[in-house]
Amino acid sequence: MFFGEIAALVVAICWTLSALFFEKAGRKIGSLSVNIIRLVWAFVLLGITLLITKQTFFPTDATGYQWFWLGLSGVVGLFLGDLFLFKSYLIIGSRTATLVMSSVPVITATIGWFFLDEILSLKSIIAILVSLSGIVIAIADRRLKIRVPAKGLLLAFGGAMGQAIGLILSKKGIGDYDPISATQIRILFGLICFIIMITALRRWPKVKEAFKDRSGIRAVSIGSF
């Protein structure tokens, strides 16, 4: 009867735990290493899931339309959004960054209202205002002065914006397509972007060195699950 509510609670708990583990891993092996390693883990785990459910490791039945929008969603959400988010973990910590990320539904609804002609009820608008007020109260003091580094806060909001836009792009491309296959396509494009970035910055030696830190690799592996 309460399957939806229970599922939402489990997702929230998993999201919080993964943020804590990713913060720990980022402080040990760097945010770039964490990003690419956890995307590889996610790609493999989803591939195994597809192998069990659809007898194929990688989705080959997506249309060009779906590839375009899901790929773009992966670039914006899983590359740019997570690039900012994981960097913010190292500056303001995962707890504050996760709090900022709670604004993703608000940003998504607002963008949908302005650009996709989606309708927001009075109840939804009140919920948005309450959510934003809660975030401001949590990160500001009594004089409304921000208590956390501005750079970290901006990076966290950049991550939230990337996630929100990524969700909208994903919604446009997914239609009635299999969600697991769609997620793997998004991850593939995000992974490709990180590979290009790490290659351009010549950071592969640092990624290779990250595997020597067992504690860091353990943390990013647990967070990926």
Feature annotation, model-predicted:
Residues 46, 111-116, 122-141:
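Hydrophobic transmembrane alpha-helices of multi-pass small-molecule transport proteins
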Residues 30-31, 93-94, 120, 178-179:
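A helix-boundary/kink motif common to multi-pass secondary transporters
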Residues 1-13, 19-33, 37-69, 82-92, ...:
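Membrane-interface interhelical linkers
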Residues 1-4, 54-65, 111-124, 172-179:
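Helix-coil boundary and interhelical linker segments in multi-pass alpha-helical membrane proteins
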